[in-house]
From Swiss-Prot:
<keyword id="KW-0251">Elongation factor</keyword>
<dbReference type="InterPro" id="IPR014039">
    <property type="entry name" value="Transl_elong_EFTs/EF1B_dimer"/>
</dbReference>
<dbReference type="GO" id="GO:0005737">
    <property type="term" value="C:cytoplasm"/>
</dbReference>
<feature type="region of interest" description="Involved in Mg(2+) ion dislocation from EF-Tu">
    <location>
        <begin position="79"/>
        <end position="82"/>
    </location>
</feature>
<keyword id="KW-0648">Protein biosynthesis</keyword>
<comment type="function">
    <text>Associates with the EF-Tu.GDP complex and induces the exchange of GDP to GTP. It remains bound to the aminoacyl-tRNA.EF-Tu.GTP complex up to the GTP hydrolysis stage on the ribosome.</text>
</comment>
<keyword id="KW-0963">Cytoplasm</keyword>
<dbReference type="InterPro" id="IPR036402">
    <property type="entry name" value="EF-Ts_dimer_sf"/>
</dbReference>
<dbReference type="InterPro" id="IPR001816">
    <property type="entry name" value="Transl_elong_EFTs/EF1B"/>
</dbReference>
<comment type="similarity">
    <text>Belongs to the EF-Ts family.</text>
</comment>
<protein>
    <recommendedName>
        <fullName>Elongation factor Ts</fullName>
    </recommendedName>
</protein>
<dbReference type="InterPro" id="IPR018101">
    <property type="entry name" value="Transl_elong_Ts_CS"/>
</dbReference>
<dbReference type="InterPro" id="IPR009060">
    <property type="entry name" value="UBA-like_sf"/>
</dbReference>
<dbReference type="Pfam" id="PF00889">
    <property type="entry name" value="EF_TS"/>
</dbReference>
<dbReference type="GO" id="GO:0003746">
    <property type="term" value="F:translation elongation factor activity"/>
</dbReference>
Length: 288
């Protein structure tokens, strides 16, 4: 049968599928656009499952903050070309908004929730794989909230608002003015992106990481042949420097090298007249 070009255009606008696929679908469904939509979906998901095994090494990080809660997620694609695709970017922004709405971090649970189109999030990702033509993988989700205070976020060098290759969210618990807390939270999120800490506090630093570093430092100091008391002071000093490199609260604030992050918070507590507790952060990076 001869396919109506206007029907092809309408089907393409509705699905994002290629002209050839739209013609094939309309031919197979007798020109019925609704049936053709379902046909494309069935064919597309079958193709998508084949593509979903391909390696993904690029993608985008997205941030969505809303008052006292916020979400961050990483969605991977095969190439930077797709990461710059408007349809892919819209998908990622919708996903991070839904992650914030559903307040979840578990990916399997999240994929079962409803997408804005009414389908499951899992099925929507599969549909986008079929339409875009590359594997798309939801790699990580982070979510933070506080009863009183704010969650702030930052994306470095965004490709569009709230989308980029590296981003962070920060939760500050406080009864201080939210507008001023938001400024502080964003500054700390910017610091996190620049300094890339591995833990919030010394107590939360992975014991294996600390033990390995202490062993390396001890071997270095042993070679100096110093008295035990001197060697112990050198080791303590180097461990303190290590904390300053990898622990957020011990790091030197990138916007003021006279303050650590802990000291910055104490300074803001004095200025705002309320205690401020940095309860958590999430840092996601697209790394090839």
């Amino acid at each position: 049968m001869k396919v109506d070009i206007n029907a092809v255009k309408e089907l393409r606008n509705l699905t994002g599928a290629g002209v050839g696929d739209c013609k094939e679908a309309l031919n197979s469904c007798g020109g019925d656009i609704e049936k053709a939509k379902n046909y494309l979906r069935e064919q597309g998901i079958a193709k998508a499952y084949k593509k979903s095994t391909k390696d993904v090494s690029d993608g985008l990080v997205a941030v969505h903050v809303n008052g006292n809660q916020g979400a961050i997620l990483e969605v991977n694609s095969e190439t930077d070309f797709v990461a710059r695709n408007e349809k892919f970017q819209k998908l990622v922004l919708n996903l991070v908004s839904l992650a914030n709405q559903y307040a979840v971090e578990d990916i399997e649970d999240f994929l079962k929730h409803e997408y804005v189109s009414g389908t499951s999030i899992h099925d929507e990702i599969m549909t986008n794989i079929a339409v875009i033509g590359e594997n798309i993988h939801l790699n990580k989700i982070g979510y933070l909230s506080v009863n009183a205070g704010v969650v702030g976020g930052y994306i470095h060098s965004p490709v569009v608002n709230n989308l980029g290759k590296i981003g962070a969210i920060v939760a500050l618990e406080s009864t201080a003015d939210n507008d001023k807390l938001n400024v502080l939270a964003r500054q700390i999120a910017m610091h996190i992106v620049a300094a890339r800490p591995e833990a919030l506090s010394v107590d939360l630093l992975d014991k294996d990481i600390l033990d390995k570093e202490r062993e390396i430092i001890k071997k270095q100091v042993d070679q100096l042949n110093k008295p035990v008391s001197v060697a112990e002071r050198i080791i303590d000093g180097r461990i303190a420097k290590f904390y300053q490199d990898v622990v957020l609260l011990e790091q030197i604030f990138v916007m003021d090298n006279q303050l650590t992050i802990s000291e910055l918070i104490k300074k803001k507590e004095s200025e705002l007249g309320a205690s401020i507790n940095l309860v958590g952060y999430k840092l996601f990076v697209i790394s090839k």
